[in-house]
Amino acid sequence: MADSRPDPESEPDSVFPREVGLFADCYSEKSRFCFCGHVLNITENFGSRLGVAARVWDAALSLCNYFESQNVDFRGKKVIELGAGTGIVGILAALQGGDVTITDLPLVLEQIQGNVQANVPPGGRAQVRALSWGIDQHVFPGDYDLVLGADIVYLEPTFPLLLGTLRHLCGPHGTIYLASKMREEHGTESFFQHLLPQHFQLELAQRDEDENVNIYRARHRGPRPA
């Protein structure tokens, strides 16, 4: 789901390899979820073209559950989701009153747009845009109140790109929520223990032992990059 991946159609030798056989058969599944009193109808378009971006991952559900249990206030907030995949986290934020930009690589946007149209009523504040970490984050404003990401920390070569993107997007008084499956083999713990704390005040907001998912909350530690 991480939207730092260069478009695999144009960069076959990128650090974001596709597992062609991961979802070899192309098909769609529709799932229903309920958070904060909203019923979310989410379509997952499985196929080798989308790869890991096709599905709703456990970390996304954990983050939505956290927003519900903690009554996180999105009303009137400027929100951006990174590596959205299906868009479920950003869609919930929009339904909760946020002014939301949902982002991923260009090839994922059609799936996200379909889910936005299926769940966010006309007039709802949810837009879908392409964003590749470390490449075009500067075309986005740097004053978001909330920056969201679910299971986007799993490829070590992308960590510096993600860190730079977070530093740019998060406003001076903004908050970052990152939910992540803690995969030791992917260096996930190292990102949260060593990289992110260099620039952000970081705290573990919630730990889901059953799913091995951590939810972190971060705020700027010092002056933001120019």
Curated annotation (Swiss-Prot):
Keywords: Cytoplasm, Cytoskeleton, Methyltransferase, S-adenosyl-L-methionine, Transferase. One of its GO terms (biological process) is peptidyl-lysine methylation. GO terms for cellular component: centrosome; chromosome; cytoplasm; cytosol; nucleoplasm; protein-containing complex. InterPro entries: Methyltransf_16 (IPR019410), SAM-dependent_MTases_sf (IPR029063). The keyword rRNA-binding does not apply. GO terms for molecular function: heat shock protein binding; methyltransferase activity; protein-lysine N-methyltransferase activity. This is EEF1A lysine methyltransferase 3. S-adenosyl-L-methionine binds at residues 57, 83-85, 104, 133, 150. Belongs to the methyltransferase superfamily. METTL21 family. It comes from Bos taurus. It catalyses: L-lysyl-[protein] + 3 S-adenosyl-L-methionine = N(6),N(6),N(6)-trimethyl-L-lysyl-[protein] + 3 S-adenosyl-L-homocysteine + 3 H(+); L-lysyl-[protein] + S-adenosyl-L-methionine = N(6)-methyl-L-lysyl-[protein] + S-adenosyl-L-homocysteine + H(+); N(6)-methyl-L-lysyl-[protein] + S-adenosyl-L-methionine = N(6),N(6)-dimethyl-L-lysyl-[protein] + S-adenosyl-L-homocysteine + H(+); N(6),N(6)-dimethyl-L-lysyl-[protein] + S-adenosyl-L-methionine = N(6),N(6),N(6)-trimethyl-L-lysyl-[protein] + S-adenosyl-L-homocysteine + H(+). It is found in: Cytoplasm; Cytoplasm, Cytoskeleton, Microtubule organizing center, Centrosome.
